[in-house]
Amino acid sequence: MTQPTRIYKHSSAGTDWAALLLGAGLGLTLALQLTTVRKSDFTSFYASLASFSRLSALVGTYLAIVGIFLVARIPWVERGVGHDRLVTWHRNLGPWSLYGIGAHVFFIVLSFAGQDSIPLYKELWLSLIHI
């Protein structure tokens, strides 16, 4: 005879802790970027664009890592929040991580094209062949 399946009740405390940890991690990620900013990062429009690009890369990558963590089937996380809620969060978070990483690619290519004073399509081609 098989053992009965355990049913866990998910409290809002687990959700609150998850949101707190997510926010703290994002805050730490942004703080790491902001502590490395130099005055030279804002000397021109294209330098500022490169700084914004790095920021969007950090946020997008952080959200991608959180998305992987959400569906990693970690028992204590599933007991605290619930698998159905974690999958919903993963589904809602996925596009935003891709938008952040895509914005990074777009803005860094635009920044390099402006700094090198070459057309955008040439910089995009140079970026693609040097990967």
Name these PLM-found stretches.
Residues 92-107:
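Hydrophobic alpha-helical membrane-insertion segments
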Residues 38-47, 115-127:
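Membrane-interface helix termini and inter-helical loops of multi-pass transporters
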Residues 25-39, 70, 105-108:
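Alpha-helical transmembrane segments of multi-pass membrane proteins
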Residues 7-22:
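N-terminal membrane topogenic signal
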Residues 81-93:
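Membrane-interface segments at loop-to-transmembrane junctions
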Residues 68-84:
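Membrane-helix interface/capping segments
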